[in-house]
Amino acid sequence: MILYPAIDLKEGHCVRLLQGDMQKATIFNDDPAAQAAAFEAQGFTALHVVDLDGAFAGKPMNAAAVDAILARVKMSVQLGGGIRDEATIEAWLGKGIARVIIGTAAVRDPDLVRRAAARFPGKIAVGIDAKDGFVAVEGWAKTAQLSAVELGKKFEDAGVAALIYTDIARDGGLTGLNIDATLALAKAVHIPVIASGGLASLADIERLTAPDCAILAGAISGRALYDGRIDPAKALALLRKD
């Protein structure tokens, strides 16, 4: 299982939000590239980056910060936020992004996901962000009448590389992953599922090593890594033993 440290970008800064609220942003680093390099030095091999401003604007808004990250690290970088058309997907992949995450557009334009997955095999993930079980879009500002499982099943035969499931109520709250909902999605589809939202402690990491979580492909951690609740070396060692 891969543990992805998260870098959320807002106005060029590395921040963490609480439940996706842009008014509840805490700046953790003014230099996202330096933060990425620090994660790489700690032993992480893959990075999860979100352009928060882009998620609301519907187009990339933190390109300079992402470019700086790509120039600084060798680790694999997956990127989401404001990726709503093939031209943007192609541009990011051309710059060296390993995998792009399509969120809002996966709900609004499912065919975009299918076209992109066919054109860029292994490079397309779908971000499923759920609020009370239903998918949220446009920076989590709106909720669609579609469940997480229903959305995941739409792409069962599309060749999508991964589904990234985030429980919005837990995101940034350090209350633990929503294991039940994440596993329900993973059992309903044949696409690898990555868990996100609420990872808070080494106990949560240990929970991910349990047999029932073997079907999960990875997990994303943000605030708990920044404030020291999760020791990177211990977390990575636990997952290596898994």
Curated annotation (Swiss-Prot):
Primary place of residence? cytoplasm
For this protein, the parts annotated as crossing the membrane are none
* Compartment(s) of residence: Cytoplasm
Name the top EC class: isomerase
| E.C. designation(s) | 5.3.1.16
Q: Do you know which Pfam families this protein is assigned to?
A: His_biosynth
- What keyword terms does UniProt attach to this protein? Amino-acid biosynthesis, Cytoplasm, Histidine biosynthesis, Isomerase
Q: Its domain of life?
A: Bacteria
Task: Give any GO molecular function from the UniProt entry.
Answer: 1-(5-phosphoribosyl)-5-[(5-phosphoribosylamino)methylideneamino]imidazole-4-carboxamide isomerase activity
Question: What's one GO-annotated cellular component?
Answer: cytoplasm
InterPro entries named in the record: Aldolase_TIM, His_biosynth, HisA_bact_arch, Isoase_HisA-like, Isoase_HisA-like_bact, RibuloseP-bd_barrel
Q: Which residues form the active site?
A: D8, D129
Name the chemical reaction catalysed here.
Answer: 1-(5-phospho-beta-D-ribosyl)-5-[(5-phospho-beta-D-ribosylamino)methylideneamino]imidazole-4-carboxamide = 5-[(5-phospho-1-deoxy-D-ribulos-1-ylimino)methylamino]-1-(5-phospho-beta-D-ribosyl)imidazole-4-carboxamide
Pathway annotation: Amino-acid biosynthesis; L-histidine biosynthesis; L-histidine from 5-phospho-alpha-D-ribose 1-diphosphate: step 4/9
Q: Which GO terms describe its biological process?
A: L-histidine biosynthetic process; L-tryptophan biosynthetic process
Which CDD domains does the entry link to? HisA (cd04732)
* UniProt similarity note: Belongs to the HisA/HisF family.
Show the NCBIfam families listed in the entry.
1-(5-phosphoribosyl)-5-[(5-phosphoribosylamino)methylideneamino]imidazole-4-carboxamide isomerase
What this protein is called in its record is: 1-(5-phosphoribosyl)-5-[(5-phosphoribosylamino)methylideneamino] imidazole-4-carboxamide isomerase
Name its species: Beijerinckia indica subsp. indica (strain ATCC 9039 / DSM 1715 / NCIMB 8712)
Underlying gene? hisA
